[in-house]
Amino acid sequence: MAKKKAFIPFLYFTSIVFFPWWISLCCNKSLKTWITNWWNTRQRETFLNEIQEKSLLEKFIQLEELFQLDEMIKEYPETDLQKFRLGIHKETIQFIKIHNEYRIHTIFNFSTNLISFVILSSYSFWGKEKLFILNSWVQEFLYNLSDTIKAFLILLLTDLCIGFHSPHGWELMIGYIYKDFGFAHYEQLLSGLVSTFPVILDTIFKYWIFRYLNRVSPSLVVIYHAIND
């Protein structure tokens, strides 16, 4: 009976880990079709951010240059000009299709993440007791570790998150999240987040060491600073 009670929180934690994948799989089969039909049949307004407007403008400038080139080579045979105009027409249609698919992908990703957040929040709320049990297990495990191991783990975690090489990792992680939500790549915003987020984490961590660890385990703080130096 005790083993069964201990197994239930572990099963609950496993379900939380795999829940987002399951939700994404279900939404991919049902929600994507509905969003595609809604976008193609009912949506009439075009909403673009600054980056997408710039991309569209660049594409149409390229097409305009092609049309100007078309005017400059009118001395060529009519059959060649028709083929040239047909090629431009096909490129325009292809560009519109790509843009349409991108908008559908953006709406789908954002909707899927929002649904996943709502479901996981509700699931976590109704399973608070199991989360409390898991939290007690983690605290007991950490409490049984020696101060040297604790200091080593803290140092390893901080070096991974806010160390010298961490900006590249944050760039990959934030870029993946940004892309997963379907947003366009914005280099300036990405650089700003990468340069400020680790600094904020570093400040919070140092405050945590100062307020919490100094009170709970002063020896751990001494070992941590000794290893860090």
From Swiss-Prot:
Please give the superkingdom of this protein's source. Answer: Eukaryota
Read off the InterPro entries from this record: CemA (IPR004282)
Main localization of the protein described in the UniProt heading: plastid
By what name is this protein known? Potassium/proton antiporter CemA
- Source organism per UniProt: Aethionema cordifolium
Segments traversing the membrane: 6-26, 107-127, 152-172, 190-210
- Cite a GO CC annotation: chloroplast inner membrane
Q: Which reaction does it catalyse?
A: K(+)(in) + H(+)(out) = K(+)(out) + H(+)(in)
Q: Which family does it belong to?
A: Belongs to the CemA family.
